[in-house]
Amino acid sequence: MSEVTTQSKPERRKRQKLEDMEGYKPSIYGLTRDELIDWAVEHGEKKFRATQIWDWLYKKRVQSFEEMTNISKDFIAKLNDNFCVNPLKQRIVQESKDGTVKYLFELPDGMLIETVLMRQHYGLSVCVTTQVGCNIGCTFCASGLIKKQRDLTAGEIVAQIMLVQKYFDDRGDGERVSHVVVMGIGEPFDNYDNVLRFLRTINNDNGLAIGARHITVSTSGLAPKIKEFANEGVQVNLAVSLHAPNNDLRSSIMRINRSFPLEKLFEAIEYYIQTTNRRVTFEYIMLNEVNDHPENAQELADLTKKIRKLSYINLIPYNPVSEHDHYSRSTKERVATFYDVLKKNGVNCVVRQEHGTDIDAACGQLRSNTMKRDRQKAVAEASGKSEGK
């Protein structure tokens, strides 16, 4: 493992709206292609200028407006007055032996987010974050250790992809991000509009052109939003974090189930499948002697029987989190038994390959650990100043 760090201020405790920050400018990545065209026309430019800017951003992937050599200085000044390009600062990069790379980025207001690059047999896949913190309250998850501070803007979500891609552009080996999973910190459907804007931007044929079938959005189960998403006409993949096959167990480990129990959740999932004719993937974290009993596997098979032809189950090895030490990873034997019960019932399932086990592997863990160190450093510095008086 290699780790590169840069100095930065600790994450601020006081919330401040981005638009109220002195000198704040939104990222131009937050505009759709049509919105960029409209903005250019409103500022006295021809439509083709917006097309040129779009190409500079997503095909040449420049990091400043000054690099756009066929754009007039006057128009560049207007762009600089209204936007920034990439709003993220790189704080930490952790590289795993298996090629997984975990990034810690700092937002304009000093808050921290994680992004993960995974090398798969089918190409480079990036897992993006959609919120600072999370309010869903899953009892096994590192992401929820810090409650939601704010939603990310569409530009901040797009910027994660752009910075990861820039790394490979700079290497000059021709590799490109081909797959995106919206499974990082936060609940994507709790930041619905910005996530939808992000999806349409990265899927745009004139931009990054990441195919819809190569994009997956994961939700903890906001049933009304699943139905709404079904009607958007966005042909991306949907994954649902299930993690338990009955209401009692699911409510005990996922607070969201108290608002949207399995009956409501599966009603929404069935609507999604009927409307889109797309397969749904279920994520199931294997927690030792909690949700990994053979009877749990049978319950899961029964629960998904009605939609078996258009559903798939990922069994996920648990990455332990120190703050949730009452949970541990299921043994290989228990996972194998669970898997066998599902297969005997004709369930399409797989035990998901692990990535980055030698770094802060759990989602949100790098961010949480960094914030702890920042706080400890701030306290130590404050204590030192006090003693020096």
Curated annotation (Swiss-Prot):
Gene Ontology molecular function terms on file: 4 iron, 4 sulfur cluster binding; metal ion binding; rRNA (adenine(2503)-C2-)-methyltransferase activity; rRNA binding; tRNA (adenine(37)-C2)-methyltransferase activity; tRNA binding
Q: Give the organism the record lists.
A: Streptococcus thermophilus (strain ATCC BAA-250 / LMG 18311)
Question: Which Enzyme Commission numbers does its entry carry?
Answer: 2.1.1.192
| Cellular component aspect of the GO annotation | cytoplasm
Q: Which NCBIfam families does the annotation name?
A: rRNA_mod_RlmN
Q: Per the entry, which co-factors are needed?
A: [4Fe-4S] cluster
Recite the UniProt cofactor note for this protein: Binds 1 [4Fe-4S] cluster. The cluster is coordinated with 3 cysteines and an exchangeable S-adenosyl-L-methionine.
Q: Where is the active site?
A: 114 (proton acceptor), 363 (s-methylcysteine intermediate)
- Cell compartments where the protein resides: Cytoplasm
Bias type Basic and acidic residues, positions: 371-389
Query: Which UniProt keywords are present, listed alphabetically?
Result: 4Fe-4S, Cytoplasm, Disulfide bond, Iron, Iron-sulfur, Metal-binding, Methyltransferase, rRNA processing, S-adenosyl-L-methionine, Transferase, tRNA processing
Q: What is its main location?
A: cytoplasm
Annotated InterPro entries: Aldolase_TIM, Methyltransferase_A, RlmN_N, RNA_MTrfase_RlmN, rRNA_lsu_MTrfase_RlmN/Cfr, rSAM
Q: What is this protein called?
A: Probable dual-specificity RNA methyltransferase RlmN
Asked if the record carries the keyword Protein transport, the reply is no
Q: Which residues form a coiled coil?
A: none
A GO BP entry: rRNA base methylation
Q: Which reaction does it catalyse?
A: adenosine(2503) in 23S rRNA + 2 reduced [2Fe-2S]-[ferredoxin] + 2 S-adenosyl-L-methionine = 2-methyladenosine(2503) in 23S rRNA + 5'-deoxyadenosine + L-methionine + 2 oxidized [2Fe-2S]-[ferredoxin] + S-adenosyl-L-homocysteine; adenosine(37) in tRNA + 2 reduced [2Fe-2S]-[ferredoxin] + 2 S-adenosyl-L-methionine = 2-methyladenosine(37) in tRNA + 5'-deoxyadenosine + L-methionine + 2 oxidized [2Fe-2S]-[ferredoxin] + S-adenosyl-L-homocysteine
Sum up the protein's function in the record's words: Specifically methylates position 2 of adenine 2503 in 23S rRNA and position 2 of adenine 37 in tRNAs.
